[in-house]
């Protein structure tokens, strides 16, 4: 995927006017390399009506380059990942290979909690409180927003996301 901040509702949503917008460079690389399949991932903000023309331009460029295009909003938690992570996925398949593509169907009743998913890892070194943590971490985790050492570590998102992380036994401040 290309950087998400130009389209994120957590940012200024500057789209093409954001210096971090790398869609043009990505499309240039697709033209130069001519891969059989292209997969592009971005935040759901790109589905905003504000970006309709921009999104359509990306899809039309892929079509002009010889790709059939398919776009869908997917959520990782629908496929067994214990995190709320909705992402827009754009698939481009070279038309000389195929014109048909189907996104995977959701995995029913496959939603795992953070505790179920990470239990083995968390208990590997004999952590005595792992059972209590596993019971507490009984939900799907919110999306990590970002962060870096330069900016003080992970950003657990808005206040409600920080609270949700705390309920899972995660302190983003270390």
What is the meaning of each model-derived region?
Residues 2-171:
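Class I S-adenosyl-L-methionine
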